[in-house]
Swiss-Prot record:
Protein known as: Solute carrier family 12 member 6
Region feature Interaction with CKB, mapped onto this chain: 1133-1150
Alphabetical list of Pfam families matching this protein: AA_permease, SLC12
Gene that encodes the chain: SLC12A6
Residues exposed to the Extracellular side: 159-165, 246-263, 317-433, 488-518
The keyword tRNA processing appears for this protein: no
Tissue-specific expression: Expressed in brain (at protein level). Highly expressed in heart, brain and kidney. Detected at lower levels in skeletal muscle, placenta, lung and pancreas. Detected in umbilical vein endothelial cells.
Regulation: Inhibited following phosphorylation by OXSR1/OSR1 and STK39/SPAK: phosphorylation takes place downstream of WNK kinases (WNK1, WNK2, WNK3 or WNK4) in response to hyperosmotic stress and subsequent cell shrinkage. Activated by N-ethylmaleimide (NEM). Inhibited by DIOA, bumetanide and furosemide.
Annotated source species: Homo sapiens
Residues modified to Phosphoserine: 32, 120, 148, 736, 981, 1023, 1029, 1032
Residue(s) carrying Phosphotyrosine: 1121
C-alpha cells in the first residue's frame, strides 16, 4: 500500500465519520439518534425530544449498519475487523448502556483516555458522580450544583445581625449555628405603627397650636407642608435604597453607609446618632413640661414673682427634673430593654387616643363648643391662673368690692380710690370664648401671622383698646421667645422625623423589601394628613390669643390642645405624657445600638470601645455616652432651643439619604436594582435641596456647625483610611483626580455590590486588518449598562519592529468601529510571535491599577471541525485556561453573527438563563444588564435550573423565586426535572464517533506534516507578515518539529517515514476495535440530556445563557471538550456561554 493512497483514504474517513454539514450527506445527521432520517437541526431536536426513553435501548440495526458502512467504505478492512464493533453495539442494544457495563471498556486504555478525572471512587461505582451533570463534576467543589445552594440562598434574608456579622456567621459550621426564629412582622405591625409612634410626638401636643397662632393658618400650613414634603421625598429615596437588597439589623445607618461608603456613612451615621440622642433629651423635656405645667404645677422647686424671671426659674426646674428623669429612664433601659418594647404598644395607643380626642372635640365644637372663657383687658390677654373673676369688681353680700384683678393693677386691693395702671383705667375687662368652635368663622382672624419679640403682650388685634401703653404686669400673657418663620420651621421639623423606624426594624420583618416602602409612605401620608388637618382645625376652632398662649395661661393653665379635645382635656394631658415618656425610652434604646453599629464597623477608631456590650448584648458603654450627650440637651432646658439642634442632625441625615439615591440612580451601578420603582434622581435631588434649604432657614449657624461636624468626621475617616492626593494646578486636575481614583481603587478587590463587568473584548482580524465579527463589539456595547471599563484587544502575529505600522492601522480601524458601535473604552493591540502568547499577554497586562478587566469576551471558533489544523480549537481552550487561572469571568458568544445590532429592537421574546452550577452569579447579572439596553428591553427573563431525582423541585422553585425576589430581578422561574436515565445507544455511538475522529485526526496530522514539510519550510521563511486571528494559532509541538527539520530529504529519513506510516496504518485498523471511554460516555450523556431539555424549552428564545463547563485538567481531552460544548449548544440560535471568575458578583444586600 503506497503512502499517497493511504492518505487519500484517510481523508475520506475523516469526512465520512464527522460530516461538517448535514447537507454534505443527505439524510445523515451527526447528532441524530436516527442517523438516516434527520435533515435539519430544528426537526432533529424536536424529533429527539419526542423519542421515548425506552426506544433508545432497543436494538438499533440502522445505527450499527450506518456505523459499519462508514468504516467499510473508508478502508475496506477484513470482515473479522468490521464485525467486531457491530457485535459490540448489538450486545449493548440488548442492555442499556450504563456505568454498570464498565467491562465493555478497554481497560488497558481507559485511564490514558480519561482526560477529565482521575478518581479512585470512579472504579468503585458511579454513585460518586451525578450522571446527568458529569460535564461539571470536576469543578463541583468550587462551582456547586444550584439545587444544593438554593435553600441557603433563599434564606439569606431576615437576619437578626448585620451583614458583617452574617458574613462571619457563614464561616461557622451548620451544627454550631443556633436556630434563628423566623421574623413574622408584617407591614402594619412592623413598619406602619412604629413609624406613627415615632413621627407623632411632643411637638404635636405642646407646640403645634402655638405655631398655628404665631405663623397664622397659611404660613403654618406652608411650614407643615414643606416639612412633610421633605420627609416624603426622603422616604421615597429611602424606599429605593431599602429595597435595593436585604437590609439586616442596622437599619438606616446600614443603608446609608453601604450606599455612600464609609466616609459619608460614618459622618451621616454619627449625625443620625446625635439626632436620636438629642431627640431623647427633647422628649424628656417635653415630658417634664407636661408634668410641671399641666399635671403637678406645685412640684416646681424654683419660683419667681417677676414675670420676666419666671421663665428662668422654669428652666432650672426643667434641668433638675430632666436630669432625674434621664437617670430613671437610663436605668430602665439598662435593666430591661424588653420592657420598653413591651410597653411600646401602650404608648402608641395613648398617641392614637389623644389624636382621636382632638378630632372628636373639633367636631363637637361645631354645635357645642367647650366653655373656656378668656379674660381680656382691652385687647390684651390676661392670665387666669391667679384671678378669681374676670372683672375689676365683684359683689359680696350686696356690696361691690375690688376683685383680685384690681389688686394686680392698683397699689391697693381694698379701696377704689387707689392709684391704678393707666391702661387698666382706660380699658374694660371682657371675657371672650376661648374655643368659639368650628362654625364660628374665627379662622378668618387666624389666617395671618403674628410674630412678636420676647416679652411682648399677646393681644387680640380685632378687640377695641385705647392707645395708652401702661406698665408691664406679670398678669398679662407674655411672649417667652422672639418668634419668626425660620424659628418655627426649626421647632416644628422634629415632629415629622421618625420615618426610619420601619427600616430600623428590618431584621424583624417578614418581607422588608415590600413592607418598608408601603408602611413608611403610608405612615407619612397619615401623619401629614393629621398635621395639615390639625393646622386648619386649630385655626378654625380656637381663639387666636389662646393659640399664641404657649403654656395655656389664658385658659387656667390647661394644655391648649386639651381645651379642644373631647371628652376631657385630661385625655390629651395623660396621653401626651405617656407617649412622650415612651418616645424618650425608645430613643434611649435605639441611639446606643446605632452607636454600637458604627463602632463595630471600626471606621472611627476612637469609638471602638463603644462597640462592646455586656453579656446579654446590651451596649452599656454606648448607653452611658448617650446619656451624657442627652444630659447636655437637658441642660439647655428649653424645648424650643433643643428642637432646632435636633432638626439639624436629622436634616443632615435625610440630605445624605437623598444624595445616596440620586448618586446611585445617576451612576446606574449594576447593583442598583431597587424593587421600589417609583423613584427618580430628580425627586431625590429635590428632597436634598429642601433639606439643605430647611437647615439654613431654621438656623443658619446651627446648620454651619452641623456641616462642620459632619465634614470633620468625613475627613477623619478618610485620613484614617487613605492618604489624600492633591492636584497640582488646574491643568493637572483631571490627571490628579484620575491618579487619586486609581490609587483608591488599588486598595483591594471591589465589594460584591460594587462589582461591574470590566470587559476585555478579544477580536479577530482578517488579512486586511478588518474585524471579522463586529457584532462582538455590538454585544459589548449592549452591556454598557454596567458602566464599567471596556478594553478591545487583538493580536497580530509577527515581529513588533516589522509590524508596528500594521498594528497602528489595525488600532485605528478598531477605534472607528468602536465609535460606530458607541463603545466607550480603550483599544489595545499586541504584536506577538505566537497568537496564544499574545492573548495571554493581553489578559495579563491590560488595564491599570483598579481599572483592570474582570471579564473576557470572545467568540466561538465556528470552523474548528472543518479545519485540518488543531490551532483552531487549541487557542480557544488555551484562552479558557488562562482566564480561569487569572480568576476572570469568560463570556463566549456562539453564532455571534446572529446577535442583534443596536438598531434592531426585539418587541417581545425571552432571555433564557440555564443555571446549572453556581459560579458567582454572572448568569443573574448579565440578563439584567442587557435589559437596560433598548434592544433587549422588552424581553422577559426566564431562569431555569435542573433538579435531580433526590431534589425537591417544588421547594427549589419556591427558593429560587425567593432568591430572585431578594436580588430585585423580575424573572419567570422554572425547575426542570432531569431524572437519572440509562445512557442511550445514541449517546454511546456519538461518543464513539467523537473518539474515532480524534484518533484519525491525530494520525492524519502526522502524515500531513511529513508530506508537506518542505513546502511548509519555504512558506514559513518567505512570509513577511502573518496576521492570524484568534482561533488559528500555531500548535507548539508542530512548530518545534518544523523548526528542527532543516535538512533536505534523505533515504534514511524516507525509510523511517515508511515505518511510521506502517504504524499509522495499524492505528487506523485499531479504530474499528475502539470502545469509547466511559467518562466520555457520561459527559456526552450530560451534553445530550441537557441539550434536549434546553432546546425543548428555549428553542424560540432570543438569547440563551448557560454555564460553560470547565476544560479538562488533562490536555489530551481538549478536542473531546470542544465536541461536548458543540453537542450542548446545538439547535440554539444565539448562545452565550458564561464562566464565572470564582467570586460573587451579585448580592441580595443593600
Amino acid at each position: 500500500m503506497h503512502p499517497p493512497e493511504t492518505t487519500t483514504k484517510m481523508a475520506s474517513v475523516r469526512f465520512m465519520v464527522t460530516p461538517t454539514k448535514i447537507d454534505d450527506i443527505p439524510g445523515l445527521s451527526d447528532t441524530s439518534p436516527d442517523l438516516s432520517s434527520r435533515s435539519s437541526s430544528r426537526v432533529r431536536f424536536s424529533s429527539r425530544e419526542s423519542v421515548p426513553e425506552t426506544s433508545r435501548s432497543e436494538p438499533m440495526s440502522e445505527m450499527s449498519g450506518a456505523t459499519t458502512s462508514l468504516a467499510t467504505v473508508a478502508l475496506d478492512p477484513p470482515s473479522d475487523r468490521t464485525s467486531h464493533p457491530q457485535d459490540v453495539i448489538e450486545d449493548l442494544s440488548q442492555n442499556s448502556i450504563t456505568g454498570e457495563h464498565s467491562q465493555l471498556l478497554d481497560d488497558g486504555h481507559k485511564k490514558a483516555r480519561n482526560a477529565y478525572l482521575n478518581n479512585s471512587n470512579y472504579e468503585e461505582g458511579d454513585e460518586y458522580f451525578d450522571k446527568n451533570l458529569a460535564l461539571f463534576e470536576e469543578e463541583m467543589d468550587t462551582r456547586p450544583k444550584v439545587s444544593s445552594l438554593l435553600n441557603r440562598m433563599a434564606n439569606y434574608t431576615n437576619l437578626t445581625q448585620g451583614a458583617k456579622e452574617h458574613e462571619e456567621a457563614e464561616n461557622i459550621t451548620e451544627g454550631k449555628k443556633k436556630p434563628t426564629k423566623t421574623p413574622q412582622m408584617g407591614t402594619f405591625m412592623g413598619v406602619y405603627l412604629p413609624c406613627l409612634q415615632n413621627i407623632f410626638g411632643v411637638i404635636l401636643f405642646l407646640r403645634l397650636t402655638w405655631v398655628v397662632g404665631t405663623a397664622g393658618v397659611l404660613q403654618a400650613f406652608a411650614i407643615v407642608l414643606i416639612c412633610c414634603c421633605c420627609t416624603m421625598l426622603t422616604a421615597i429615596s429611602m424606599s429605593a435604597i431599602a429595597t435595593n437588597g436585604v437590609v439586616p439589623a442596622g437599619g438606616s445607618y446600614f443603608m446609608i453607609s453601604r450606599a455612600l461608603g464609609p466616609e459619608f456613612g460614618g459622618a451621616v451615621g454619627l449625625c443620625f446618632y446625635l439626632g436620636t440622642t438629642f431627640a431623647a433629651a427633647m422628649y424628656i423635656l417635653g415630658a417634664i413640661e407636661i408634668f410641671l405645667v399641666y399635671i403637678v404645677p406645685r412640684a416646681a422647686i424654683f419660683h419667681s414673682d417677676d414675670a420676666l424671671k419666671e421663665s428662668a426659674a422654669m428652666l432650672n426646674n426643667m434641668r433638675v427634673y430632666g436630669t432625674a428623669f434621664l437617670v430613671l429612664m437610663v436605668l430602665v433601659v439598662f435593666i430591661g430593654v424588653r420592657y420598653v418594647n413591651k410597653f411600646a404598644s401602650l404608648f402608641l395607643a395613648c398617641v392614637i387616643v389623644s389624636i382621636l380626642a382632638i378630632y372628636a372635640g373639633a367636631i363637637k365644637s361645631s354645635f357645642a363648643p367647650p366653655h373656656f372663657p378668656v379674660c381680656m383687658l382691652g385687647n390684651r390677654t390676661l392670665s387666669s391662673r391667679h384671678i378669681d373673676v374676670c372683672s375689676k369688681t365683684k359683689e359680696i353680700n350686696n356690696m361691690t368690692v375690688p376683685s383680685k384683678l384690681w389688686g394686680f393693677f392698683c397699689n391697693s386691693s381694698q379701696f377704689f380710690n387707689a392709684t391704678c395702671d393707666e391702661y387698666f383705667v382706660h380699658n374694660n375687662v371682657t371675657s371672650i370664648q376661648g374655643i368659639p368652635g368650628l362654625a364660628s368663622g374665627i379662622i378668618t382672624e387666624n389666617l395671618w401671622s403674628n410674630y412678636l419679640p420676647k416679652g411682648e403682650i399677646i393681644e387680640k388685634p380685632s378687640a377695641k383698646s385705647s392707645d395708652v401703653l401702661g406698665s408691664l404686669n406679670h398678669e398679662y400673657v407674655l411672649v417667652d421667645i422672639t418668634t419668626s418663620f425660620t424659628l418655627l420651621v426649626g421647632i416644628f421639623f422634629p415632629s415629622v422625623t421618625g420615618i426610619m423606624a420601619g427600616s430600623n426594624r428590618s431584621g424583624d420583618l417578614k418581607d422588608a423589601q415590600k413592607s418598608i416602602p408601603i408602611g413608611t409612605i403610608l405612615a407619612i401620608l397619615t401623619t401629614s394628613f393629621v398635621y395639615l388637618s390639625n393646622v386648619v382645625l386649630f385655626g378654625a376652632c380656637i381663639e387666636g390669643v389662646v393659640l399664641r398662649d404657649k403654656f395655656g395661661d389664658a385658659v387656667k393653665g390647661n394644655l391648649v390642645v386639651g381645651t379642644l379635645s373631647w371628652p376631657s382635656p385630661w385625655v390629651i394631658v395623660i396621653g401626651s405624657f405617656f407617649s412622650t415618656c415612651g418616645a424618650g425610652l425608645q430613643s434611649l434604646t435605639g441611639a446606643p445600638r446605632l452607636l454600637q453599629a458604627i463602632a463595630k464597623d471600626n471606621i472611627i477608631p476612637f469609638l471602638r470601645v463603644f462597640g462592646h456590650s455586656k453579656a446579654n448584648g446590651e451596649p452599656t458603654w454606648a448607653l452611658l455616652l448617650t446619656a451624657a450627650i442627652a444630659e447636655l440637651g437637658i441642660l439647655i432646658a428649653s424645648l424650643d432651643l433643643v428642637a432646632p439642634i435636633l432638626s439639624m442632625f436629622f436634616l443632615m441625615c435625610y440630605l445624605f439619604v437623598n444624595l445616596a439615591c440620586a448618586l446611585q440612580t445617576l451612576l446606574r451601578t449594576p447593583n442598583w436594582r431597587p424593587r421600589f420603582r417609583y423613584y427618580h434622581w430628580a425627586l431625590s435631588f429635590m428632597g436634598m435641596s429642601i433639606c439643605l434649604a430647611l437647615m439654613f432657614i431654621s438656623s443658619w449657624y446651627y446648620a454651619i456647625v452641623a456641616m462642620v461636624i459632619a465634614g470633620m468626621i468625613y475627613k477623619y475617616i478618610e485620613y484614617q483610611g487613605a492618604e489624600k492626593e492633591w492636584g497640582d494646578g488646574i491643568r493637572g486636575l483631571s490627571l490628579s483626580a484620575a491618579r487619586f481614583a486609581l490609587l483608591r481603587l488599588e486598595e483591594g478587590p471591589p465589594h460584591t455590590k460594587n462589582w461591574r463587568p470590566q470587559l476585555l473584548v478579544l477580536l479577530k482580524l482578517d488579512e486586511d486588518l478588518h474585524v471579522k465579527h463586529p457584532r462582538l463589539l455590538t454585544f459589548a456595547s449592549q452591556l454598557k449598562a454596567g458602566k464599567g471599563l471596556t478594553i478591545v484587544g487583538s493580536v497580530i502575529v509577527g515581529n513588533f519592529l516589522e509590524n508596528y505600522g500594521e498594528a497602528l492601522a489595525a488600532e485605528q480601524t478598531i477605534k472607528h468601529l468602536m465609535e460606530a458601535e458607541k463603545v466607550k473604552g480603550f483599544c489595545q493591540l499586541v504584536v506577538a510571535a505566537k497568537l496564544r502568547e499574545g492573548i495571554s499577554h493581553l489578559i495579563q497586562s491590560c488595564g491599570l491599577g483598579g481599572m483592570k478587566h474582570n471579564t473576557v469576551v470572545m467568540g466561538w471558533p465556528n470552523g474548528w471541525r472543518q479545519s485540518e489544523d488543531a490551532r483552531a480549537w487549541k487557542t480557544f481552550i488555551g484562552t479558557v485556561r488562562v482566564t480561569t487561572a487569572a480568576h476572570l469571568a469568560l463570556l463566549v458568544a456562539k453564532n455571534i453573527s446572529f446577535f442583534p445590532s443596536n438598531v434592531e429592537q426585539f418587541s417581545e421574546g425571552n432571555i433564557d438563563v440555564w443555571w446549572i452550577v453556581h459560579d458567582g452569579g454572572m448568569l443573574m447579572l448579565l440578563p439584567f444588564l442587557l435589559k437596560q439596553h433598548k434592544v433587549w428591553r422588552k424581553c422577559s427573563i426566564r431562569i431555569f435550573t435542573v433538579a435531580q431525582l433526590e431534589d425537591n423541585s417544588i421547594q427549589m422553585k419556591k427558593d429560587l423565586a425567593t432568591f430572585l425576589y431578594h436580588l430585585r430581578i423580575e424573572a419567570e422561574v422554572e425547575v426542570v426535572e432531569m431524572h437519572d436515565s440509562d445512557i442511550s445507544a445514541y449517546t454511546y455511538e456519538r461518543t464513539l464517533m467523537m473518539e474515532q475522529r480524534s484518533q484519525m485526526l491525530r494520525h492524519m496530522r502526522l502524515s500531513k506534516t511529513e508530506r508537506d514539510r518542505e513546502a511548509q519550510l519555504v512558506k514559513d521563511r518567505n512570509s513577511m507578515l502573518r496576521l492570524t486571528s484568534i482561533g488559528s494559532d500555531e500548535d507548539e509541538e508542530t512548530e518545534t518539529y518544523q523548526e528542527k527539520v532543516h535538512m533536505t530529504w534523505t533515504k534514511d529519513k524516507y525509510m523511517a517515514s515508511r515505518g511510521q506510516k506502517a504504524k499509522s496504518m495499524e492505528g487506523f485498523q485499531d479504530l474499528l476495535n475502539m470502545r469509547p471511554d466511559q467518562s466520555n460516555v457520561r459527559r456526552m450523556h450530560t451534553a445530550v440530556k441537557l441539550n434536549e431539555v434546553i432546546v425543548n424549552k428555549s428553542h424560540e428564545a432570543k438569547l440563551v445563557l448557560l454555564n460553560m463547563p470547565g476544560p479538562p485538567r488533562n490536555p489530551e481531552g481538549d478536542e473531546n471538550y470542544m465536541e461536548f460544548l458543540e453537542v450542548l449548544t446545538e439547535g440554539l440560535e444565539r448562545v452565550l456561554l458564561v464562566r464565572g471568575g470564582g467570586s460573587e458578583v451579585i448580592t441580595i444586600y443593600s
